[in-house]
From Swiss-Prot:
Gene name of the encoded protein: psbH
HAMAP family xref list: PSII_PsbH
Keyword Translocase appears in the UniProt entry: no
Upper classification of the organism: Bacteria, Bacillati, Cyanobacteriota, Cyanophyceae, Synechococcales
Full protein name: Photosystem II reaction center protein H
Protein location: Cellular thylakoid membrane
Length: 67
């Protein structure tokens, strides 16, 4: 038998949509756009780390992090 708590009563509306699927594609295109932007961000970080994207006056060595 489940015990009713105040926290459970507060969280119940968040679970009311369980099992329901929005018709069509929903927010999939928006998610795809953010995934592409995140991928581009990761590529830029990787290129900076590998020094294949050169930025003037920015040192990416570990020694530059020391005080």
């Amino acid at each position: 038998m489940a015990i009713r708590t105040k926290l459970g009563d507060l969280l119940r509306p968040l679970n009311s949509e369980y099992g329901k699927v929005a018709p069509g594609w929903g927010t999939t295109p928006l998610m795809a756009v953010f995934m592409v932007l995140f991928g581009i961000f990761l590529l830029i970080i990787l290129q900076i780390y590998n020094k294949s994207l050169l930025l003037e006056d920015i040192n990416v060595s570990w020694e530059s992090l020391s005080f």
